[in-house]
Amino acid sequence: MAIQISPNGRLMTIQTNDSSYQMLADKNGVLLHLYYGSSIGAEDLSDLIVRSDVGFSGNPEEAGLDRTYSLDTLPQEIASSGVGDFRDDSVRLAHPDGSCAADFRFESCEVVSGAYSIPGMPALYDTDKKNSETLIIKMKEKASGAILHLYYGVWEEENVITRTASLTNAGKEPIYIEKFLSCSMDMMDRDLDLISFTGRHAMERTMERTPVTHIKTEFGSIRGTSSHHYNPAMILCDRHATEDAGDCFGLCLAYSGSFTAMAQKDQRDQIRVQMGINPYQFRWCLTEGETFFAPQVILSFSNQGFSKLSHQYHDILHEHMCRGRYKHERRPVLINNWEATYFDFNEEKIEKIAAQAGELGIEMMVLDDGWFGKRDDDNSGLGDWFVNEKKIRGGLPKLSEKIHEKGMKFGLWFEPEMISEDSDLYRAHPDWAITIPGRVPNHARNQLVLDMTRSDVRDYLMARFEEILGNTKIEYVKWDMNRSICDMYSHIYKGEQSG
């Protein structure tokens, strides 16, 4: 069994081929993180926790007169908020009375076969329930009664453990989620470096390596996308770890929105590491019976350096994240007209590029930006997803047919989330753009962003794309996104639901 639970149901050990992950629900229901690293078998590591009286670290009521028991110093699996742990929290809740506190205690745990799924978000999948198991830990908030479920997906052969969490409002009054991270853990007795991958436009994923110290190292994005500036992944590793030697802990967030990642030593030199949705401008109203899910974090451990860690991620993502026919097929070699023509093209230019590319063995022609609406530069036309037949005489079906006659596949460019102010769509529906009333919006590439939370926006886009893709033989879609999101506001969701 990849997941082992002690007879009293409070010591939980996760085993992969080469790693172990252990937690303990103590007598007060606090969920403690004991260990993550090389395999330990059935060893009980609860004796690793050494408590001491630390000044200015207070004590919960259950401690009584025991000043060595403090949420501020215990190595935890879920970081409480506002109740005595002065390190970074992982769950922050605001309540109708104006208070802001969260203190979750262990209730129960269970093991189920197969991988868990997350509504509306990507997660590793297991089609036959033979490759994975899931540990589900139920916790309850002491005052509000809110129910927290922690999910641990275990991929034994792949040396991967996934984490996510869900929060359910079990009370009558609304709860306001202000922070809800996917993963938090406190690692004892470690002296580690943090590796992150930063960058900018046209120069993404530049590796940076820095020691984890008492000064918090935090990176992330508030752009509405993970972005090329900061990749939603990090590696914690031994100070002297190399490609082929040393302990390495990988954390990869399966989420393309705003995110945060953090590592910091506390006063006892434990390292708190966290990852999840960025709490910047985040406030989610959870009404009675509603549940909120966090995105998935994919963890992997290697005791043989970065190379093994990389291969473990390659294998799990290829086999259990990728879908469709090209999961195991070679993808076609393509040519794109953008750098050759920019907006200045017609069907004859595209056919000529395709013909020359086909002679070189290139297998797909992708038609880029400029085929729709009044789109002769980047100042206009976005959102008007109707073929410009002044450029493409006979329309896309005819062009696609000619490309296929050359023995090539045909692909098409879209930027669905964007809108130009100089467009028929904006003139008809200015409220569909993300703008704040009374403020002139920020422009990037001369465009605004559509409010994709609106059903009418989604319905319009689906109707246009279904018509285009349904009437034209298209094997590939280039889905672009050329700006970040700001001026956060919705013209249909008010107050706490907007932003």
Question: What is each residue range found by the language model?
Answer:
Residues M1-M12, Q270-T287:
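Short acidic, Pro/Gly- and aromatic-enriched capping/linker segments at domain boundaries
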Residues I5, R10-N17, Y21, L31-Q264, ...:
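Polysaccharide-binding surfaces and accessory modules of carbohydrate-active proteins
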Residues D18, A165, G289, I335, ...:
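Conserved, mostly hydrophobic/aromatic
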Residues A101-F106, W284-N303:
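Short Pro-Gly-centered flexible turn/kink motifs
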Residues F180, S256, I298, I335-A340, ...:
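Active-site beta-loop-alpha junctions enriched in small/polar residues
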Residues T291, P332-N336, E363-M364, G407-G411, ...:
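Structural preference for beta-strand elements that scaffold enzyme active sites
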Residues K349-F372, N471:
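Catalytic domains of carbohydrate-active enzymes, especially glycoside hydrolases
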Residues D369-G499:
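Aromatic- and carboxylate-enriched substrate-binding clefts and catalytic-loop regions
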